[in-house]
Protein backbone atom coordinates (compact mmCIF):
# COMPACT_ATOMS: atom_id res chain seq x y z
CA UNK A 1 0.00 0.00 0.00
CA UNK A 2 1.40 3.39 -0.99
CA UNK A 3 1.81 6.01 1.72
CA UNK A 4 0.52 8.51 -0.82
CA UNK A 5 -3.00 7.07 -0.34
CA UNK A 6 -2.93 7.98 3.37
CA UNK A 7 -1.41 11.41 2.65
CA UNK A 8 -4.15 12.23 0.12
CA UNK A 9 -6.88 11.26 2.60
CA UNK A 10 -5.18 13.29 5.35
CA UNK A 11 -5.19 16.27 2.99
CA UNK A 12 -8.95 15.90 2.49
CA UNK A 13 -9.64 15.25 6.18
CA UNK A 14 -7.77 18.41 7.18
CA UNK A 15 -10.22 20.54 5.19
CA UNK A 16 -13.41 19.02 6.65
CA UNK A 17 -15.25 20.53 9.61
CA UNK A 18 -18.23 18.13 9.73
CA UNK A 19 -17.76 15.04 11.90
CA UNK A 20 -20.15 13.03 9.71
CA UNK A 21 -18.08 13.80 6.62
CA UNK A 22 -14.89 13.12 8.59
CA UNK A 23 -16.19 9.69 9.65
CA UNK A 24 -17.38 8.78 6.14
CA UNK A 25 -14.05 9.75 4.56
CA UNK A 26 -12.09 7.86 7.21
CA UNK A 27 -14.27 4.78 6.65
CA UNK A 28 -13.48 5.02 2.94
CA UNK A 29 -9.74 5.08 3.71
CA UNK A 30 -10.00 2.05 6.01
CA UNK A 31 -12.02 0.04 3.48
CA UNK A 32 -9.38 0.70 0.78
CA UNK A 33 -6.42 -0.07 3.04
CA UNK A 34 -4.26 -3.20 2.74
CA UNK A 35 -5.81 -5.63 5.24
CA UNK A 36 -2.45 -7.23 6.08
CA UNK A 37 -1.22 -3.95 7.60
CA UNK A 38 -4.55 -2.55 8.84
CA UNK A 39 -3.22 -2.24 12.40
CA UNK A 40 -0.35 -0.02 11.19
CA UNK A 41 -2.76 2.10 9.14
CA UNK A 42 -4.97 2.62 12.21
CA UNK A 43 -1.99 3.61 14.37
CA UNK A 44 -0.83 6.12 11.74
CA UNK A 45 -4.36 7.57 11.60
CA UNK A 46 -4.12 8.00 15.39
CA UNK A 47 -0.83 9.84 14.93
CA UNK A 48 1.32 7.18 16.59
CA UNK A 49 3.47 4.16 15.74
CA UNK A 50 2.10 1.96 18.50
CA UNK A 51 -0.30 2.17 21.44
CA UNK A 52 0.88 4.28 24.41
CA UNK A 53 0.50 1.34 26.79
CA UNK A 54 3.45 -0.50 25.23
CA UNK A 55 5.73 2.10 26.77
CA UNK A 56 7.93 2.24 23.66
CA UNK A 57 9.85 5.46 22.95
CA UNK A 58 8.27 8.25 20.95
CA UNK A 59 9.94 9.50 17.78
CA UNK A 60 12.07 11.97 19.73
CA UNK A 61 13.01 14.40 16.97
CA UNK A 62 12.85 18.06 17.95
CA UNK A 63 12.15 21.06 15.76
CA UNK A 64 15.84 21.83 15.23
CA UNK A 65 16.59 18.33 13.95
CA UNK A 66 13.50 18.22 11.76
CA UNK A 67 14.72 21.40 10.09
CA UNK A 68 18.07 19.69 9.47
CA UNK A 69 16.36 16.62 7.96
CA UNK A 70 14.24 18.82 5.66
CA UNK A 71 17.37 20.75 4.70
CA UNK A 72 19.21 17.54 3.71
CA UNK A 73 16.21 16.05 1.88
CA UNK A 74 15.47 19.16 -0.19
CA UNK A 75 19.08 20.32 -0.64
CA UNK A 76 18.16 23.64 0.99
CA UNK A 77 20.27 25.73 3.36
CA UNK A 78 19.18 25.25 7.01
CA UNK A 79 18.75 29.00 7.53
CA UNK A 80 16.42 29.17 4.53
CA UNK A 81 14.31 26.32 5.96
CA UNK A 82 14.20 28.07 9.34
CA UNK A 83 13.23 31.43 7.83
CA UNK A 84 10.44 29.84 5.79
CA UNK A 85 9.22 28.12 8.96
CA UNK A 86 9.12 31.46 10.81
CA UNK A 87 7.01 32.87 7.98
CA UNK A 88 4.60 29.92 7.61
CA UNK A 89 4.56 28.49 11.15
CA UNK A 90 4.07 24.89 9.95
CA UNK A 91 7.07 22.63 9.27
CA UNK A 92 4.89 20.21 7.32
CA UNK A 93 3.90 22.97 4.91
CA UNK A 94 7.57 24.04 4.71
CA UNK A 95 8.52 20.51 3.62
CA UNK A 96 5.70 20.45 1.05
CA UNK A 97 6.75 23.76 -0.51
CA UNK A 98 10.43 22.90 -0.68
CA UNK A 99 9.68 19.47 -2.17
CA UNK A 100 7.38 21.08 -4.77
CA UNK A 101 10.11 23.54 -5.68
CA UNK A 102 12.70 20.77 -5.86
CA UNK A 103 10.38 18.65 -8.01
CA UNK A 104 9.67 21.43 -10.50
CA UNK A 105 13.33 22.48 -10.87
CA UNK A 106 14.88 18.98 -10.85
CA UNK A 107 15.76 16.94 -13.91
CA UNK A 108 12.52 14.89 -13.71
CA UNK A 109 10.49 18.07 -13.60
CA UNK A 110 12.45 19.45 -16.55
CA UNK A 111 11.71 16.30 -18.56
CA UNK A 112 8.00 16.63 -17.71
CA UNK A 113 7.80 13.57 -15.47
CA UNK A 114 7.95 12.94 -11.74
CA UNK A 115 8.21 9.14 -12.00
CA UNK A 116 10.00 7.59 -9.02
CA UNK A 117 9.81 4.62 -6.70
CA UNK A 118 6.70 4.87 -4.52
CA UNK A 119 6.94 5.22 -0.75
CA UNK A 120 5.01 2.39 0.92
CA UNK A 121 3.24 2.39 4.28
CA UNK A 122 5.45 -0.52 5.38
CA UNK A 123 8.61 1.42 4.52
CA UNK A 124 7.40 4.53 6.34
CA UNK A 125 6.37 2.51 9.39
CA UNK A 126 9.57 0.46 9.64
CA UNK A 127 11.84 3.48 9.09
CA UNK A 128 10.03 5.63 11.65
CA UNK A 129 10.13 2.70 14.09
CA UNK A 130 13.93 2.63 13.69
CA UNK A 131 13.98 6.38 14.30
CA UNK A 132 12.03 5.94 17.53
CA UNK A 133 13.98 2.93 18.82
CA UNK A 134 17.51 4.07 17.92
CA UNK A 135 19.50 4.99 21.04
CA UNK A 136 23.08 5.53 22.15
CA UNK A 137 26.03 7.42 20.76
CA UNK A 138 25.42 8.90 17.32
CA UNK A 139 21.71 8.05 17.48
CA UNK A 140 20.62 11.63 16.82
CA UNK A 141 22.57 11.83 13.56
CA UNK A 142 21.22 8.44 12.50
CA UNK A 143 17.64 9.55 13.24
CA UNK A 144 18.14 12.65 11.07
CA UNK A 145 19.62 10.58 8.21
CA UNK A 146 16.77 8.05 8.34
CA UNK A 147 14.13 10.76 8.29
CA UNK A 148 15.93 12.70 5.55
CA UNK A 149 16.01 9.50 3.49
CA UNK A 150 12.22 9.14 3.77
CA UNK A 151 11.66 12.79 2.89
CA UNK A 152 13.91 12.46 -0.17
CA UNK A 153 11.70 9.67 -1.53
CA UNK A 154 8.46 11.41 -0.57
CA UNK A 155 6.40 13.58 -2.91
CA UNK A 156 5.38 17.05 -1.59
CA UNK A 157 2.11 15.91 0.02
CA UNK A 158 3.72 12.84 1.60
CA UNK A 159 6.52 15.04 2.98
CA UNK A 160 3.99 17.41 4.56
CA UNK A 161 2.26 14.68 6.54
CA UNK A 162 5.45 12.77 7.33
CA UNK A 163 6.84 15.88 9.04
CA UNK A 164 3.57 16.53 10.86
CA UNK A 165 3.43 12.90 11.98
CA UNK A 166 6.95 13.09 13.40
CA UNK A 167 6.05 16.36 15.15
CA UNK A 168 2.95 14.75 16.66
CA UNK A 169 0.70 17.31 14.95
CA UNK A 170 -1.30 15.64 12.21
CA UNK A 171 -4.10 18.23 12.59
CA UNK A 172 -6.74 16.09 10.88
CA UNK A 173 -9.16 16.19 13.82
CA UNK A 174 -9.59 12.47 14.46
CA UNK A 175 -10.44 11.14 17.91
CA UNK A 176 -10.80 7.50 18.96
CA UNK A 177 -14.61 7.70 18.86
CA UNK A 178 -14.45 8.82 15.21
CA UNK A 179 -12.11 5.93 14.35
CA UNK A 180 -14.52 3.48 16.06
CA UNK A 181 -17.47 4.76 14.02
CA UNK A 182 -15.42 4.64 10.82
CA UNK A 183 -14.39 1.03 11.56
CA UNK A 184 -18.06 0.10 12.06
CA UNK A 185 -18.93 1.53 8.64
CA UNK A 186 -15.86 0.10 6.86
CA UNK A 187 -15.80 -3.40 8.38
CA UNK A 188 -19.10 -3.98 10.18
CA UNK A 189 -21.61 -2.99 7.54
CA UNK A 190 -22.75 0.18 9.28
CA UNK A 191 -23.40 1.92 12.57
CA UNK A 192 -25.15 -1.18 13.98
CA UNK A 193 -21.71 -2.69 14.55
CA UNK A 194 -20.57 0.30 16.63
CA UNK A 195 -21.67 -1.21 19.96
CA UNK A 196 -19.83 -4.47 19.30
CA UNK A 197 -16.63 -2.66 18.32
CA UNK A 198 -16.89 -0.21 21.21
CA UNK A 199 -17.32 -3.02 23.75
CA UNK A 200 -14.24 -4.77 22.35
CA UNK A 201 -12.24 -1.53 22.47
CA UNK A 202 -13.31 -0.93 26.09
CA UNK A 203 -11.96 -4.37 27.04
CA UNK A 204 -8.81 -4.04 24.92
CA UNK A 205 -7.88 -0.41 24.40
CA UNK A 206 -5.92 -1.01 21.19
CA UNK A 207 -7.69 0.12 18.02
CA UNK A 208 -5.06 -1.45 15.76
CA UNK A 209 -5.51 -4.82 17.47
CA UNK A 210 -9.32 -4.57 17.19
CA UNK A 211 -9.11 -3.69 13.47
CA UNK A 212 -6.80 -6.66 12.82
CA UNK A 213 -9.18 -9.08 14.59
CA UNK A 214 -12.11 -7.79 12.48
CA UNK A 215 -10.36 -8.14 9.10
CA UNK A 216 -8.89 -11.56 9.98
CA UNK A 217 -11.81 -13.18 11.86
CA UNK A 218 -14.84 -10.99 11.23
CA UNK A 219 -16.96 -8.77 13.45
CA UNK A 220 -18.50 -11.80 15.22
CA UNK A 221 -15.12 -12.62 16.78
CA UNK A 222 -15.37 -9.45 18.86
CA UNK A 223 -18.48 -10.69 20.67
CA UNK A 224 -16.47 -13.31 22.59
CA UNK A 225 -13.45 -11.09 23.18
CA UNK A 226 -12.02 -11.15 26.72
CA UNK A 227 -9.53 -8.83 28.42
CA UNK A 228 -5.90 -9.61 27.64
CA UNK A 229 -3.05 -9.13 30.09
CA UNK A 230 -0.74 -6.44 28.70
CA UNK A 231 -3.51 -4.51 26.92
CA UNK A 232 -5.26 -2.10 29.33
CA UNK A 233 -9.01 -2.09 29.89
CA UNK A 234 -10.59 1.35 29.57
CA UNK A 235 -11.45 2.36 33.15
CA UNK A 236 -14.98 2.47 34.53
CA UNK A 237 -16.01 6.03 35.42
CA UNK A 238 -18.31 7.48 38.06
CA UNK A 239 -21.12 9.99 38.01
CA UNK A 240 -21.13 12.69 40.69
CA UNK A 241 -23.66 13.99 43.19
CA UNK A 242 -23.27 16.24 46.23
CA UNK A 243 -26.23 14.98 48.25
CA UNK A 244 -25.67 11.80 50.35
CA UNK A 245 -29.42 11.14 50.65
CA UNK A 246 -29.87 11.24 46.89
CA UNK A 247 -26.82 9.02 46.33
CA UNK A 248 -28.07 6.29 48.66
CA UNK A 249 -31.53 6.52 47.08
CA UNK A 250 -29.94 5.97 43.64
CA UNK A 251 -28.24 2.88 45.07
CA UNK A 252 -31.49 1.39 46.33
CA UNK A 253 -30.59 2.09 49.95
CA UNK A 254 -27.54 -0.19 50.11
CA UNK A 255 -24.01 0.23 48.71
CA UNK A 256 -20.31 -0.39 49.15
CA UNK A 257 -18.52 2.87 50.00
CA UNK A 258 -14.77 3.22 49.31
CA UNK A 259 -12.38 6.01 50.19
CA UNK A 260 -11.70 8.24 47.18
CA UNK A 261 -7.94 8.59 47.44
CA UNK A 262 -5.91 11.58 46.28
CA UNK A 263 -3.47 9.46 44.28
CA UNK A 264 -2.84 7.97 40.84
CA UNK A 265 -5.37 5.47 39.55
CA UNK A 266 -3.52 2.39 38.36
CA UNK A 267 -4.44 -0.75 36.45
CA UNK A 268 -2.05 -3.56 37.36
CA UNK A 269 -1.51 -6.53 35.04
CA UNK A 270 0.41 -9.72 35.78
CA UNK A 271 1.26 -12.72 33.63
CA UNK A 272 3.72 -15.21 35.14
CA UNK A 273 6.70 -13.04 36.20
CA UNK A 274 5.79 -10.00 34.08
CA UNK A 275 3.99 -7.08 35.73
CA UNK A 276 2.70 -3.94 33.99
CA UNK A 277 1.19 -0.80 35.50
CA UNK A 278 -1.04 1.47 33.40
CA UNK A 279 -2.32 4.95 34.23
CA UNK A 280 -5.86 6.24 33.94
CA UNK A 281 -4.81 7.46 30.46
CA UNK A 282 -3.67 3.90 29.65
CA UNK A 283 0.00 4.89 29.51
CA UNK A 284 2.64 2.45 30.69
CA UNK A 285 3.94 3.85 34.01
CA UNK A 286 5.65 0.66 35.22
CA UNK A 287 9.10 2.32 35.26
CA UNK A 288 7.90 4.95 37.76
CA UNK A 289 6.86 2.33 40.31
CA UNK A 290 9.43 -0.49 40.61
CA UNK A 291 8.47 -0.71 44.30
CA UNK A 292 4.82 -1.38 43.37
CA UNK A 293 5.96 -4.08 40.93
CA UNK A 294 7.87 -5.68 43.80
CA UNK A 295 4.89 -5.44 46.18
CA UNK A 296 2.50 -7.00 43.66
CA UNK A 297 4.94 -9.82 42.96
CA UNK A 298 5.27 -10.59 46.69
CA UNK A 299 1.81 -9.98 48.07
CA UNK A 300 -0.78 -10.76 45.36
CA UNK A 301 -1.50 -14.42 44.65
CA UNK A 302 -2.13 -15.57 41.09
CA UNK A 303 -0.32 -16.24 37.83
CA UNK A 304 -2.47 -14.05 35.59
CA UNK A 305 -4.69 -11.14 36.58
CA UNK A 306 -5.82 -7.56 35.99
CA UNK A 307 -6.61 -5.55 39.12
CA UNK A 308 -7.22 -1.88 39.80
CA UNK A 309 -6.37 0.48 42.61
CA UNK A 310 -4.95 3.83 43.65
CA UNK A 311 -1.25 4.49 44.21
CA UNK A 312 -1.00 6.97 47.10
CA UNK A 313 2.03 8.85 48.42
CA UNK A 314 2.69 8.11 52.09
CA UNK A 315 4.60 10.18 54.64
CA UNK A 316 7.64 7.99 55.48
CA UNK A 317 7.62 9.07 59.13
CA UNK A 318 3.94 9.28 60.08
CA UNK A 319 2.47 6.85 57.56
CA UNK A 320 -0.22 9.41 56.70
CA UNK A 321 -1.47 9.90 53.15
CA UNK A 322 0.12 12.72 51.16
CA UNK A 323 -1.46 14.66 48.23
CA UNK A 324 -1.31 13.59 44.59
CA UNK A 325 1.35 16.24 43.78
CA UNK A 326 3.91 14.24 45.79
CA UNK A 327 3.77 11.51 43.14
CA UNK A 328 4.89 13.99 40.48
CA UNK A 329 8.39 13.87 41.97
CA UNK A 330 8.65 10.31 40.69
CA UNK A 331 8.25 11.55 37.13
CA UNK A 332 10.78 14.34 37.53
CA UNK A 333 13.57 12.59 39.43
CA UNK A 334 16.24 10.89 37.34
CA UNK A 335 17.10 8.48 40.18
CA UNK A 336 13.88 6.53 40.70
CA UNK A 337 15.31 4.57 43.64
CA UNK A 338 16.11 7.79 45.46
CA UNK A 339 12.53 8.92 44.74
CA UNK A 340 11.19 5.68 46.25
CA UNK A 341 12.95 6.49 49.54
CA UNK A 342 11.79 10.12 49.58
CA UNK A 343 8.26 9.50 48.29
CA UNK A 344 7.14 6.01 49.33
CA UNK A 345 3.72 4.76 48.28
CA UNK A 346 0.96 2.37 49.29
CA UNK A 347 -1.47 0.73 46.87
CA UNK A 348 -5.16 0.62 47.76
CA UNK A 349 -6.97 -1.94 45.57
CA UNK A 350 -10.66 -1.61 44.76
CA UNK A 351 -11.43 -3.89 41.80
CA UNK A 352 -10.55 -7.04 39.90
CA UNK A 353 -11.43 -7.42 36.21
CA UNK A 354 -9.63 -10.60 35.12
CA UNK A 355 -8.23 -13.61 36.98
CA UNK A 356 -6.73 -16.88 35.73
CA UNK A 357 -8.35 -16.72 32.27
CA UNK A 358 -11.78 -15.66 33.59
CA UNK A 359 -13.38 -12.34 32.57
CA UNK A 360 -14.70 -10.74 35.76
CA UNK A 361 -15.99 -7.53 34.13
CA UNK A 362 -19.34 -9.26 33.64
CA UNK A 363 -19.59 -10.36 37.28
CA UNK A 364 -21.13 -8.27 40.10
CA UNK A 365 -18.99 -6.07 42.35
CA UNK A 366 -19.44 -8.27 45.43
CA UNK A 367 -18.00 -11.30 43.60
CA UNK A 368 -15.10 -9.25 42.24
CA UNK A 369 -14.33 -7.74 45.64
CA UNK A 370 -14.57 -11.10 47.45
CA UNK A 371 -11.99 -12.66 45.12
CA UNK A 372 -9.76 -9.57 45.33
CA UNK A 373 -9.75 -9.71 49.13
CA UNK A 374 -8.86 -13.42 49.05
CA UNK A 375 -5.71 -13.00 46.90
CA UNK A 376 -4.04 -10.19 48.89
CA UNK A 377 -1.60 -11.52 51.48
CA UNK A 378 -1.26 -9.57 54.76
CA UNK A 379 1.32 -6.80 54.27
CA UNK A 380 1.97 -3.09 54.88
CA UNK A 381 2.10 -1.92 51.24
CA UNK A 382 -0.76 -3.33 49.17
CA UNK A 383 -4.17 -3.21 50.82
CA UNK A 384 -7.85 -3.31 49.99
CA UNK A 385 -9.33 0.20 49.82
CA UNK A 386 -10.87 1.39 53.11
CA UNK A 387 -14.58 0.65 52.76
CA UNK A 388 -17.88 -0.01 54.48
CA UNK A 389 -21.26 -1.30 53.40
CA UNK A 390 -23.75 1.51 54.04
CA UNK A 391 -27.53 1.14 54.24
CA UNK A 392 -28.25 4.49 55.90
CA UNK A 393 -27.28 8.11 55.30
CA UNK A 394 -25.67 8.56 58.73
CA UNK A 395 -23.11 5.81 58.05
CA UNK A 396 -22.39 7.25 54.60
CA UNK A 397 -21.84 10.77 55.98
CA UNK A 398 -19.70 9.54 58.86
CA UNK A 399 -17.47 7.52 56.52
CA UNK A 400 -17.24 10.49 54.14
CA UNK A 401 -15.99 12.80 56.92
CA UNK A 402 -13.53 10.16 58.05
CA UNK A 403 -12.13 9.88 54.50
CA UNK A 404 -11.68 13.66 54.32
CA UNK A 405 -9.98 13.82 57.73
CA UNK A 406 -7.48 11.14 56.69
CA UNK A 407 -6.41 12.96 53.51
CA UNK A 408 -8.85 11.52 50.99
CA UNK A 409 -10.85 13.47 48.41
CA UNK A 410 -14.17 11.99 49.51
CA UNK A 411 -15.83 8.64 48.85
CA UNK A 412 -16.90 6.44 45.95
CA UNK A 413 -20.34 4.91 46.44
CA UNK A 414 -20.78 1.68 44.46
CA UNK A 415 -23.88 -0.31 43.62
CA UNK A 416 -24.21 -3.92 44.72
CA UNK A 417 -26.41 -6.64 43.28
CA UNK A 418 -26.34 -8.84 40.19
CA UNK A 419 -26.34 -5.90 37.74
CA UNK A 420 -23.34 -4.16 39.34
CA UNK A 421 -20.87 -5.21 36.62
CA UNK A 422 -17.61 -3.47 35.68
CA UNK A 423 -18.69 -1.08 32.89
CA UNK A 424 -15.37 -0.69 31.07
CA UNK A 425 -15.01 2.70 29.39
CA UNK A 426 -18.43 3.88 30.57
CA UNK A 427 -19.61 6.54 32.98
CA UNK A 428 -22.75 5.52 34.82
CA UNK A 429 -24.73 5.47 38.05
CA UNK A 430 -23.27 2.18 39.29
CA UNK A 431 -20.50 4.32 40.79
CA UNK A 432 -21.14 7.79 42.24
CA UNK A 433 -18.46 10.03 43.72
CA UNK A 434 -19.12 12.28 46.68
CA UNK A 435 -16.31 14.81 47.10
CA UNK A 436 -15.76 17.55 49.65
CA UNK A 437 -17.57 20.86 49.12
CA UNK A 438 -15.17 23.54 47.98
CA UNK A 439 -17.15 26.21 49.85
CA UNK A 440 -18.62 27.56 46.67
CA UNK A 441 -21.99 27.09 45.00
CA UNK A 442 -20.43 24.53 42.64
CA UNK A 443 -20.41 21.25 44.52
CA UNK A 444 -17.28 20.00 42.76
CA UNK A 445 -14.43 20.93 40.48
CA UNK A 446 -14.58 20.06 36.80
CA UNK A 447 -11.88 18.91 34.38
CA UNK A 448 -11.99 20.92 31.16
CA UNK A 449 -10.03 20.94 27.89
CA UNK A 450 -8.09 23.96 26.61
CA UNK A 451 -9.27 24.82 23.08
CA UNK A 452 -8.06 28.42 22.71
CA UNK A 453 -6.16 31.30 24.28
CA UNK A 454 -6.54 35.06 24.72
CA UNK A 455 -3.77 37.65 24.95
CA UNK A 456 -3.66 39.78 28.09
CA UNK A 457 -3.49 43.51 28.59
CA UNK A 458 -1.23 45.76 30.66
CA UNK A 459 1.61 43.83 32.30
CA UNK A 460 0.30 40.66 30.65
CA UNK A 461 0.22 42.29 27.22
CA UNK A 462 1.54 40.08 24.42
CA UNK A 463 1.15 36.95 26.55
CA UNK A 464 -1.64 34.39 26.66
CA UNK A 465 -3.29 35.09 30.00
CA UNK A 466 -6.69 33.42 29.74
CA UNK A 467 -7.95 30.19 28.25
CA UNK A 468 -11.08 29.08 26.43
CA UNK A 469 -12.18 25.86 28.13
CA UNK A 470 -14.51 23.14 26.89
CA UNK A 471 -16.38 20.09 28.18
CA UNK A 472 -16.41 16.81 26.24
CA UNK A 473 -19.55 15.60 24.48
CA UNK A 474 -19.09 11.83 23.95
CA UNK A 475 -22.24 11.60 21.81
CA UNK A 476 -20.76 13.86 19.12
CA UNK A 477 -17.06 13.30 20.00
CA UNK A 478 -16.67 17.07 20.27
CA UNK A 479 -15.57 19.73 22.76
CA UNK A 480 -18.17 22.39 23.65
CA UNK A 481 -17.01 25.69 25.14
CA UNK A 482 -18.06 26.32 28.74
CA UNK A 483 -15.95 29.19 30.13
CA UNK A 484 -13.02 31.55 29.75
CA UNK A 485 -10.63 31.21 32.70
CA UNK A 486 -8.15 33.94 33.62
CA UNK A 487 -7.54 33.54 37.37
CA UNK A 488 -5.63 31.05 39.47
CA UNK A 489 -2.42 31.08 37.42
CA UNK A 490 0.94 31.94 38.99
CA UNK A 491 3.45 34.03 36.99
CA UNK A 492 5.51 30.88 36.44
CA UNK A 493 2.47 29.01 35.13
CA UNK A 494 1.67 31.86 32.75
CA UNK A 495 5.23 31.77 31.38
CA UNK A 496 4.96 28.00 30.93
CA UNK A 497 1.56 28.49 29.27
CA UNK A 498 3.06 30.44 26.37
CA UNK A 499 5.33 27.56 25.41
CA UNK A 500 2.63 24.90 25.93
CA UNK A 501 0.12 26.62 23.67
CA UNK A 502 2.48 27.77 20.92
CA UNK A 503 3.47 24.14 20.38
CA UNK A 504 -0.16 23.16 19.65
CA UNK A 505 -1.35 26.38 17.98
CA UNK A 506 -3.70 26.05 14.99
CA UNK A 507 -4.57 28.45 12.19
CA UNK A 508 -8.25 27.56 12.37
CA UNK A 509 -10.64 26.01 14.87
CA UNK A 510 -10.21 22.26 15.39
CA UNK A 511 -13.05 20.30 13.72
CA UNK A 512 -13.95 18.66 17.05
CA UNK A 513 -14.35 22.04 18.79
CA UNK A 514 -17.78 23.69 19.00
CA UNK A 515 -17.48 27.33 20.07
CA UNK A 516 -19.20 30.64 19.34
CA UNK A 517 -16.44 32.54 21.09
CA UNK A 518 -13.39 33.42 18.97
CA UNK A 519 -10.12 33.30 20.93
CA UNK A 520 -6.95 35.05 19.80
CA UNK A 521 -5.43 31.65 19.05
CA UNK A 522 -6.96 28.22 18.52
CA UNK A 523 -5.12 25.15 19.84
CA UNK A 524 -5.31 21.37 19.56
CA UNK A 525 -7.60 19.96 22.30
CA UNK A 526 -4.79 18.30 24.24
CA UNK A 527 -4.41 19.76 27.73
CA UNK A 528 -6.86 19.16 30.60
CA UNK A 529 -7.15 21.51 33.60
CA UNK A 530 -9.07 21.28 36.86
CA UNK A 531 -11.38 24.28 37.26
CA UNK A 532 -13.61 25.54 40.08
CA UNK A 533 -16.25 28.29 39.90
CA UNK A 534 -19.01 29.93 41.87
CA UNK A 535 -21.89 28.35 39.93
CA UNK A 536 -23.08 27.08 36.56
CA UNK A 537 -25.26 29.54 34.72
CA UNK A 538 -27.06 29.99 31.40
CA UNK A 539 -24.93 31.79 28.82
CA UNK A 540 -25.54 32.86 25.22
CA UNK A 541 -21.75 32.93 24.72
CA UNK A 542 -21.07 29.22 25.14
CA UNK A 543 -22.09 26.03 23.36
CA UNK A 544 -22.05 23.51 26.23
CA UNK A 545 -25.57 21.95 26.23
CA UNK A 546 -26.69 24.44 23.57
CA UNK A 547 -30.52 24.76 23.42
CA UNK A 548 -30.99 22.15 26.19
CA UNK A 549 -31.92 24.50 29.03
CA UNK A 550 -32.77 27.59 27.03
CA UNK A 551 -33.05 28.33 23.29
CA UNK A 552 -29.94 29.85 21.69
CA UNK A 553 -27.99 29.54 24.94
CA UNK A 554 -25.62 27.08 26.56
CA UNK A 555 -24.19 26.61 30.04
CA UNK A 556 -21.20 28.41 31.48
CA UNK A 557 -19.14 28.45 34.69
CA UNK A 558 -19.32 31.75 36.56
CA UNK A 559 -16.07 33.14 38.01
CA UNK A 560 -13.95 30.15 36.92
CA UNK A 561 -10.53 29.65 38.54
CA UNK A 562 -7.63 27.40 37.51
CA UNK A 563 -6.66 24.80 40.13
CA UNK A 564 -4.08 22.57 38.43
CA UNK A 565 -3.19 20.71 35.26
CA UNK A 566 -4.57 17.17 34.98
CA UNK A 567 -1.78 15.43 33.07
CA UNK A 568 -3.26 12.10 34.15
CA UNK A 569 -6.36 12.72 32.02
CA UNK A 570 -6.83 12.60 28.27
CA UNK A 571 -9.19 15.11 26.61
CA UNK A 572 -11.83 12.39 26.34
CA UNK A 573 -11.59 11.89 30.13
CA UNK A 574 -12.69 15.49 30.74
CA UNK A 575 -15.97 16.38 32.43
CA UNK A 576 -18.79 15.67 29.99
CA UNK A 577 -21.50 18.06 28.85
CA UNK A 578 -24.08 15.79 30.50
CA UNK A 579 -22.22 16.12 33.81
CA UNK A 580 -22.22 19.92 33.49
CA UNK A 581 -25.98 19.77 32.85
CA UNK A 582 -26.46 17.46 35.85
CA UNK A 583 -24.50 19.85 38.07
CA UNK A 584 -26.58 22.77 36.80
CA UNK A 585 -29.82 20.92 37.55
CA UNK A 586 -28.64 20.03 41.07
CA UNK A 587 -27.79 23.63 41.99
CA UNK A 588 -30.12 25.48 44.36
CA UNK A 589 -32.16 27.55 41.92
CA UNK A 590 -32.73 31.23 42.53
CA UNK A 591 -35.96 32.97 41.59
CA UNK A 592 -34.14 34.87 38.88
CA UNK A 593 -31.38 33.14 36.93
CA UNK A 594 -27.94 34.65 37.63
CA UNK A 595 -26.88 36.74 34.65
CA UNK A 596 -24.08 35.33 32.56
CA UNK A 597 -20.71 37.02 32.86
CA UNK A 598 -19.80 38.98 29.75
CA UNK A 599 -16.59 37.17 28.85
CA UNK A 600 -16.07 39.15 25.68
CA UNK A 601 -14.63 42.11 27.58
From Swiss-Prot:
What molecular function does GO assign, one term? DNA ligase (ATP) activity
Q: Required co-factor?
A: a divalent metal cation
Leader peptide range in chain numbering: none
Q: What biological process terms from GO does the record include?
A: cell division; DNA biosynthetic process; DNA recombination; DNA repair; lagging strand elongation
Reaction catalysed by this chain? ATP + (deoxyribonucleotide)n-3'-hydroxyl + 5'-phospho-(deoxyribonucleotide)m = (deoxyribonucleotide)n+m + AMP + diphosphate
Database matches in InterPro entries: ATP-dep_DNA_ligase, DNA_ligae_ATP-dep_bac/arc, DNA_ligase_ATP-dep, DNA_ligase_ATP-dep_C, DNA_ligase_ATP-dep_cent, DNA_ligase_ATP-dep_CS, DNA_ligase_ATP-dep_N, DNA_ligase_N_sf
- Enzyme class (EC, first level): ligase
Q: Keywords on this record?
A: ATP-binding, Cell cycle, Cell division, DNA damage, DNA recombination, DNA repair, DNA replication, Ligase, Magnesium, Metal-binding, Nucleotide-binding
Q: Name one Pfam family in it.
A: DNA_ligase_A_N
List the EC numbers from the record. Answer: 6.5.1.1
Binding-site list for ATP: 258, 265, 280, 310, 350, 427, 433
PROSITE patterns per UniProt: DNA_LIGASE_A1 (PS00697), DNA_LIGASE_A2 (PS00333), DNA_LIGASE_A3 (PS50160)
Catalytic residues, per the record, are 260 (n6-amp-lysine intermediate)
Describe regulators of its activity. Ligase activity stimulated by PCNA heterotrimer.
Known role: DNA ligase that seals nicks in double-stranded DNA during DNA replication, DNA recombination and DNA repair. Interaction with PCNA enhances ligase activity. DNA polymerase I, DNA ligase and the flap endonuclease may be constitutively associated with the PCNA heterotrimer forming a scanning complex able to couple DNA synthesis and Okazaki fragment maturation.
Q: Which HAMAP family match?
A: DNA_ligase
Q: Describe, as the record does, how this protein assembles with itself and its partners.
A: Interacts with the PCNA heterotrimer, probably via subunit PCNA3.
Q: Which family does it belong to?
A: Belongs to the ATP-dependent DNA ligase family.
Name of the protein in question: DNA ligase
* Taxonomic path: Archaea, Thermoproteota, Thermoprotei, Sulfolobales, Sulfolobaceae
Gene name linked to the record: lig
